[in-house]
């Protein structure tokens, strides 16, 4: 199942939708139990996910649904999760971290080899597809990175590795330059 968020220009609101092929189906028009925004959808946890997956399967099977599909090309796409409550970025590749530190005249951090290292990033600076606003004088200092982000959809504490998949709502392509 693919989920998107877009700006509904008619209602001037954010809208979450299921994407099937090149057509988007608004969640809350498919079923009144499904919320209109991605944040509300993720807060619904298992119940909203199960219901959305059922509608996704119905659409893919060719069954008629209540929501009128909209071509994705006609939508003003936002980031899939436009307003996450938190954004954490992990250092995953030693070679990349070492090169970045070396370029700044810094030694490699020993903690990298001892435990998973992450930092809190600015969750208020999330952008969807389109042009990136960058000051030209600083462009050469940016480190463009193609990453995959895991969207954690359910609350948890000290989650064991073998249970981690149960807390992931989905994945997003991300660039955190």
Task: Give, region by region, the residue ranges found by the protein language model.
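Low-complexity, small/basic-enriched stretches
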Residues: 1-40
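Active-site microenvironments in enzyme catalytic cores
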Residues: 1-8, 19, 43-177
């Amino acid at each position: 199942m693919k989920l998107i968020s877009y700006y509904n220009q008619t209602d001037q609101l954010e809208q979450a939708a299921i994407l099937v092929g090149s057509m988007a189906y608004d969640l809350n028009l498919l079923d009144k139990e499904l919320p209109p925004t991605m944040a509300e959808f993720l807060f619904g946890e298992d119940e909203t996910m199960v219901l959305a997956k059922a509608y996704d399967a119905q659409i893919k099977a060719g069954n008629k649904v209540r929501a009128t599909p909209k071509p994705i090309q006609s939508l003003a796409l936002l980031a899939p999760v436009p307003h996450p409550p938190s954004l954490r970025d992990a250092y995953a590749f030693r070679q990349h971290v070492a090169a970045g530190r070396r370029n700044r005249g810094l030694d490699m951090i020993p903690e990298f080899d001892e435990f998973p290292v992450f930092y809190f990033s600015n969750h208020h600076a999330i952008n969807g597809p389109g042009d990136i606003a960058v000051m030209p004088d600083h462009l050469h200092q940016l480190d463009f990175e193609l990453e995959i982000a895991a969207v954690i959809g359910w609350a948890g504490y000290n989650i064991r590795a073998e249970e981690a998949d149960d807390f992931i709502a989905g994945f997003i392509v991300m660039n955190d330059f």
